[in-house]
Amino acid sequence: MTETTGVATAAERALRLVVEGMSFPAILTVPAGEVAGAVLLVPGSLFSDANGDYPAWKVRPHVYAHLARQLAAAGWASLRYAKPGPGTGTETLDADAAVAHHRFATRVTVARAALETMRRELADAGAAAPRAVVAGHSEGAVVAFLLAQDAPAVDGVVCLAGPSVGLIGIMREQVGDHLPPGASVDEARANFDAAMAHVHRGEAIPRELIGLPGTMMLGNVDLAGWAYIRQVDAVDPAAEAAHVPQPMLIVQGGRDSSVREHHAHRIAAARGEGSTEVAFFPELQHFFKPLPPGTPPMQAFGLEGETDPRVVDAIARWGRAIAPR
């Protein structure tokens, strides 16, 4: 553990997680005073650093750093960590072992290691948390659902803009967001479906299907990338949420064009008799920032500024009501 810094009402310490031949930057944030609990922040898809920025695309929502520091102000410790990818600070230590990270299941392995590290580091610092919560953002919510089912030390799960369907289903919903003026959404989705038929069979997408409305960006993914996407898509998030035994808080923004509002309702319905609460914020986007109406999806995704503190207010209030398992 290195680089201890003070951040207002918190201390932040940089760590490295070593899992399956790779080293991941992570940051432990510890509040001043009594610790109400600890939150593991599980990142979503794409190449994000520990703060929740995307250096490869120069998109910097800073969402995980904002959440961590707001949580600390509310008395909660947290751990956030990077994902493999350009500019995120991850390092390959053993190339043969690191092949494991081409499998979606390894995301759960990394999250489990991060959870154990968070608990150990807090205990060593004399700040053991009375309750532990796993908060997964976007695709990270799916990881959180899978982790919590086999983690008795987890007292609660927070679904932050989590999907209720597989990744290819989410991609299909987004097809209409990237069309030129006048293009037909129905035609674009038909093109997308034709391309995905090849992906589901493990085939390369034919060249004649690339570059059409609905498939403009699909040519950037190679066969290995599609193999990984198929693994993610094979998981049914709503079904996995139903199997989570812990209490769950679902947080959703009404102007989220990446994972739309109906997913929150579908996950809540899938929970059945499970203890579930929904915190809905009509004007927030995917990174929980207020979004002016009519903002184009790509501009919405790149929005900077502080993450709305009402999200952490909801997490902290809900979390304090959880009885430790």
Question: Can you name each region flagged by the protein language model?
Answer:
Residues 2-34, 38:
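N-terminal cap/lid segment of alpha/beta-hydrolase-fold proteins
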Residues 33-35, 39-73:
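Short, surface-exposed "cap/lid" segments of acyl-processing enzymes
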Residues 99-122:
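Alpha/beta-hydrolase active-site loop
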Residues 117-178:
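Primarily recognizes the serine-hydrolase "nucleophile elbow" in alpha/beta-hydrolase
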Residues 158-239:
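Accessory cap/linker subdomain of secreted extracellular hydrolases
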Residues 287, 293-325:
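Catalytic active-site module of serine/aspartate enzymes centered on a nucleophile-bearing elbow/loop
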